[in-house]
Amino acid sequence: MLVGCALGASGAALQGVARNPLAAPDTLAVNAGAHLAVTAAAVVGASLGALPGVAVAFAGGVAAAGVVIGLSGGPAASPVRLVLAGTAITLGLSSVTQALLVLFPWETQGLFAWGAGSLGQNGMGTVRAIAPVVVVAFLGLVLLGRRLDLLGLGDDAARSLGVDVARTRLVGVLLAVLLATCAVTVTGPIGFVGLCAPLLVRLLATWVRPLGRHRLLIPAAAVAGTALVLTADVALRAVFGPVSGVTVPTGVVTSLIGAVALVVLARRARAALEPDTLVTLRAGSDLARRAPAVLLGAGVLLLVGVVVAGVLLGDSTVLLGDVANWVAGKASVRLDIILDSRVPRVAAALLAGACLALAGALVQTVTRNPLADPGVLGVSHAAGLGAVVVIVLTSAPSFALVFGGALVGAVLAGLLVFGVTAGSGMASGRMVLVGLGTGAAASAVTTLLLVRTDPWNQNRAITWLGGSTFGAGAPQLVPMAVALAIGVLVAARTHRDLDLVQVDDVTPRVLGVDLPRSRTLHVGIAVLLTAAATAAIGPVVFVGLVAPHAARMLIGKRHRWTLPLTVVLGAALVCVADLVGRTAIAPAQLPAGLVTAVIGTPYFLWLLWRMRATSRR
């Protein structure tokens, strides 16, 4: 009850402060920031009680929410833009958290299930210690309700009525984040309660109008949040039994409910949920306009250098002459062992980066959203779920089975996104919302499988989910090479269509481009590319987001040049990540997917800042 009340009230307040129906502790990365802070405290050996745990989680949650709200444009941001910014920040923070779980398994033992949100982790002592904090924060938000109502009229109107907008917004965010982090401290991050509870109350407010005022909306959302959490807990006990049901995180059920809510919201939403003007950075330099081939050639040389460094460097350094002897079959046994494992890993990183970068470029173009990537459409998560199903249910799965599972998951996600958005002409904003819901559902089911499986399979799957090239060979390389070849051939034939699709919905139709068909084709190719890369090395984030942006900044928006440079930069990024993961803490290793998140998160923060600055001009 305490957790549901805190999350429901927190979500209602955040939506009021941000004037955004999709604002919530999940979508503003509050839960991810709090989770990372608590995990980091466990890594350094800090033994936190209830209230110190709240303080640590609060610091992480406030920092994450401040970054998302500040860099996405605050109240001026569209709902989809805010959610995309929060999702990307959440990906980065979650990847860092997962890296800590992999590197420090003993110090963080038990935090995986906690990170999914479980009610059976703390006794009444923790609840009694935190309850007064929740009550004080809750009452503070209720007292702030009238000012939140006035904020809904707009900043200028609120100021004219005597509201200190900046102070009201700051106090509202701090109290809402405090409630959310109290819940995180007790049970871990329980997903989407803060989104769904206010949504239910706002639906009721269409019949009971007083519920639209925050002094009633916040308590009503608290009640709805409590009902959601209790319903999820009862459902788990009914399905898995009174004993086993306690071991399954409650956040699994609430995340599934939230996923359904996002899909329903996408179907019923009007234009207000479409992305606002898709502001991008100035694309291309003077050199790119005069001689784009020179920039592309420089990118290829960079990739060659990265590949050579990846082959030569690692826990043991080899020379170019050693590689030549290995190719000629004259190397020593030691060199054979080193290069037989290292060269396929470098090749896997190269192909996976190229596949994910091309997939990201296609998704960003057809959705006309610079913050989109295959993960945003739920494809990456669904591919990961399909592969995890195979890993968990079979003792020694072949790569063919893992690839098949990933492909099935990715295709099902793509079909769901297409099916739900087909009636609206596959509008980009709806595609994004449905994709986010699909990804949330896939992540929830993945967590359920991992929690219910044995420790051996759980550790194996968690490591794979980090995105590792370890053990890569021909079975992994061939499907990626085939998928990349198909993607490159299609892109080469349709690059002019993509130039038109990125403009608006009208221009392509006027010039004879079948827009729904084009979106279907290119998202289908993105699904294939993502499935191949995910099956080979696991989920790798930010490549499909960062590489297309960097390519556009360097060489411009003409896809004839943008797509090849995107492929080159994506391949180089994952190769660098794999090299860093193999050498930074040798002989131990970090999965490449976690390193790309660490590299990609600062770049993405800078990107959001530049985009916001550009939108103000």
PLM regions: where:
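Alpha-helical transmembrane segments in inner-membrane proteins
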Residues: 1-617
